Amino acid sequence: MLLPWLILIPFIGGFLCWQTERFGVKVPRWIALITMGLTLALSLQLWLQGGYSLTQSAGIPQWQSEFDMPWIPRFGISIHLAIDGLSLLMVVLTGLLGVLAVLCSWKEIEKYQGFFHLNLMWILGGVIGVFLAIDMFLFFFFWEMMLVPMYFLIALWGHKASDGKTRITAATKFFIYTQASGLVMLIAILALVFVHYNATGVWTFNYEELLNTPMSSGVEYLLMLGFFIAFAVKMPVVPLHGWLPDAHSQAPTAGSVDLAGILLKTAAYGLLRFSLPLFPNASAEFAPIAMWLGVIGIFYGAWMAFAQTDIKRLIAYTSVSHMGFVLIAIYTGSQLAYQGAVIQMIAHGLSAAGLFILCGQLYERIHTRDMRMMGGLWSKMKWLPALSLFFAVATLGMPGTGNFVGEFMILFGSFQVVPVITVISTFGLVFASVYSLAMLHRAYFGKAKSQIASQELPGMSLRELFMILLLVVLLVLLGFYPQPILDTSHSAIGNIQQWFVNSVTTTRP
């Protein structure tokens, strides 16, 4: 019975934030913080109940906790929520980054506090819904629902980019890309339900029943592409990434933390949970193309990151590069690579959130994100440059951080399946060190390039230090002791891999 509350608490909290703004600007902040704290506590409570590492019978999805209530029975639509090790880890990550998103916008957001927190809470509620929904209609409902508040977050509270583009442009671009891709997925979901109805005479949107839908290989390939396009836009996969750099560079800090830390993960989760098990043969056929797209993403993201002058755009392109590794892992069919992908998703969520929070703190002090205006900042403020150095080396996959474990497991698992692609993508790690260190050098070393950068700047407050040090501790912990994550995700990931590999060997009619 905890599952519906994981989704309801952020929605109710967001509504309260909006309505209590009249009692003072601090009230919505505290309500939002308590709301996300409660959501995180509930998800940790579910984790502590355990049972996630039990072995499962292959090919049958088994959930640790489930909630099912009829919604539109005539079409077989129900409010069907379920959690296993994979979705649990994503929900915990959402809760944690939700708390940090509220904290990092404590001083940054000054206008429409209540409405800001309404949008922030509803994005997080929608994301948790995506991770828990097992009814395809409900999944699509939450998938679309998290887009509208994100649009408002960028359009109303965004910053003007250093290249002069406006926040409205960025928000509209984000909305058009994601709406168009969502429409493609809706068509694919409806077509899948219709194919199932033709075969069985039963209308259903239930994921477990749709898993065994008999269909021809041509139909399966088309439907798989519908799902893949929707997830590829959100992930983002080159060449469908056009919305990401603009959305990141114009979004407020909380928006960037949510985008990089959580929203991109919904796409990787969608591929693992829906795309592979529903269309295993088509996915296996499409795998080489998807992996090469991942390789292109790794190099394109790295080169574009190196060329940026806006520090937030640089970090946005690093996300394109890192998610390329995850895409390669998803299509290998190797359990080791899958577990690496889960660790990489969590580590990237933490390290990207850290970098964006530090960017926000830097922007509050010098009021620019243009690295051509920085330089020489290392000696001008306490803590912030040194912590930026930590997150930069975490991003390039330094041993001892979670990013290294994730990338190593992905490359190790993929090498057995696609050695050529693995060897080529390894060079992407070299480029990662180039753009990470270039960012540090341009911003913190050398001579001060403007009046702003040459004056003494205030150090970090306790709130700012707490957020960043929490992320540092978690990343190092993940780097040295990833076992709890591996144990939790093991059976869920093993199940997806079994389904994918077994179905490929015993092809459909």
From Swiss-Prot:
GO biological process, one term: electron transport coupled proton transport
InterPro entries in the record: NADH_Q_OxRdtase_chainM/4, NADH_UbQ_OxRdtase, ND/Mrp_TM
Topological region Periplasmic: 51-82, 143-173, 243-258, 307-313, 361-382, 425, 486-509
Catalysed reaction, written as an equation: a quinone + NADH + 5 H(+)(in) = a quinol + NAD(+) + 4 H(+)(out)
Enzyme Commission designation: 7.1.1.-
Keyword flag Transmembrane helix: yes
Pfam family, one: Proton_antipo_M
Transmembrane segments: 1-21, 30-50, 83-103, 122-142, 174-194, 222-242, 259-279, 286-306, 314-334, 340-360, 383-403, 404-424, 426-446, 465-485
Domain of life assignment: Bacteria
Keyword Transmembrane helix assigned: yes
Subunit structure: Composed of 13 different subunits. Subunits NuoA, H, J, K, L, M, N constitute the membrane sector of the complex.
Protein name: NADH-quinone oxidoreductase subunit M
Species annotation: Escherichia coli (strain K12)
